[in-house]
């Protein structure tokens, strides 16, 4: 299994952020796309990049620059020809690959607390869904996944709705499961809005104003995340990770503010 982690030993003691790439790309590409964030946060956080479990064709947004950087991976189905996997198996694979990325970083000598999830596009959807599962377990059972206490999420171009990451949780209405394509192009999306699936773990949302999926990203922000715990950055870009210093600086500032708010420092 391949994961990409920061190789700078000076960061091994720092709080860690687990990073989930988009669909049709991979951890190596996402690390390159996040180079501005890595540079700006290198003295404060260790960013660890997890690889998704499932093989995929390349996403159209990576072909122009990263066409030779395969193989490409995905967390969820995003095309009809992707094999249907039982949802419980899909969730188990996602959890396994995330746990292995975290364990590999432990073996590399890192000791910092896992404080946040950072995801782009499909990785942001999965990150938000994982945070919602953590919140649901805490509320229903007074516990959370073993060893996991993500304090906040950084959601870049994340799309609603959440997906169900635990078939044992009885939710009303039920969320789409991890075997489904949830691109919000179908009328059933209305079932999920305003129905109580609200994430209260703090989140930072980063939206490109020229992103074709902007309306769907705003749905995640407006309809699925609590007003008192959500933050928003809008920048002049399309479906990609901010790279210019002025845009990256805004994201870094808000990450620092979330860290203060959630007691990281």
Curated annotation (Swiss-Prot):
GO cellular component, one term: nucleus
Active site: 121, 211, 239
GO molecular function terms listed in the Swiss-Prot or TrEMBL record: hydrolase activity
GO terms, biological process: antibiotic biosynthetic process; monocarboxylic acid biosynthetic process; secondary metabolite biosynthetic process
Pathway as given in its UniProt record: Secondary metabolite biosynthesis
Gene3D superfamilies: alpha/beta hydrolase
Pfam families noted in UniProt: FSH1 (PF03959)
Enzyme nomenclature, EC number: 3.1.2.-
Keyword field: Hydrolase
Keyword Repressor: no
InterPro entries named in the record: AB_hydrolase_fold, FSH-like_dom, LovG
Task of the protein: Esterase; part of the cla gene cluster that produces clavatol and ortho-quinone methide. The clavatol biosynthesis cluster cla and the terrestric acid cluster tra are both involved in the production of peniphenones and penilactones. The non-reducing PKS claF is responsible for the formation of clavatol from successive condensations of 3 malonyl-CoA units, presumably with a simple acetyl-CoA starter unit, and 2 methylation steps. The esterase claE probably collaborates with claF by catalyzing the hydrolysis of ACP-bound acyl intermediates to free the ACP from stalled intermediates.
Family per record: Belongs to the LovG family.
PANTHER family: ESTERASE DBAE-RELATED, ESTERASE OVCA2
Protein name: Esterase claE
Species annotation: Penicillium crustosum
Biological classification of the source: Eukaryota, Fungi, Dikarya, Ascomycota, Pezizomycotina
Designated gene of the protein: claE
